[in-house]
């Protein structure tokens, strides 16, 4: 049997970051264009506004990121200014073992990187997902690292950091 796990024919999974920075609902614009309408803005109308971060929340057990299927016993989404939670989770939701482990995307926006990181820290603190293991502790750990706040990292940084945790 074959399953389509995800089809990104137009939008990327990170599109909420673009939406937050530019203040444009990309899905709405896509539907407008598909309906034969023009977009509701011009290229010159777009202005970069602040900094946005998205973390992909997965039902995975650390440190090896193995799948963590099961039933959500308690769920509370964070909220507030500059916080967006995209998820279909609810109390009692059953996460099957057959598909991608992505269970939500937490997107934050602030005037600058420092404010976005502070909002991410607050939002992760408000977020409750009980009943399965998730990658939320990974993001708490990352936010405690100076390099994340200063932007002093590269594509190998995470792998090296994870190695230090398992030592």
What is the predicted function of each stretch?
Residues 1-167:
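ATP-dependent carboxylate activation and anion-phosphoryl transfer catalytic cores
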């Amino acid at each position: 049997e074959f399953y389509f796990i995800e089809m990104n024919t137009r939008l990327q999974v990170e599109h909420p970051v673009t939406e937050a920075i530019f203040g444009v609902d990309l899905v709405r614009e896509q539907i407008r264009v598909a309906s034969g309408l023009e977009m509701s803005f011009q290229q010159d109308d777009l202005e970069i506004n602040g900094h946005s971060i998205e973390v992909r929340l997965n039902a995975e057990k650390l440190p090896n990121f193995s799948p963590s299927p099961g039933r959500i016993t308690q769920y509370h989404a964070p909220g507030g200014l500059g916080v967006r939670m995209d998820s279909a989770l609810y109390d009692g939701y059953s996460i099957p073992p057959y598909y991608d482990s992505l269970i939500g995307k937490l997107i934050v926006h602030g005037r600058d990187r420092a404010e976005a990181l502070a909002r991410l820290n607050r939002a992760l603190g408000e977020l409750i997902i009980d009943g399965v293991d998730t990658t939320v502790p990974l993001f708490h750990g990352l936010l405690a690292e100076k390099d994340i706040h200063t932007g002093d990292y590269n594509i190998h940084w995470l792998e090296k950091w994870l190695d230090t945790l398992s030592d």
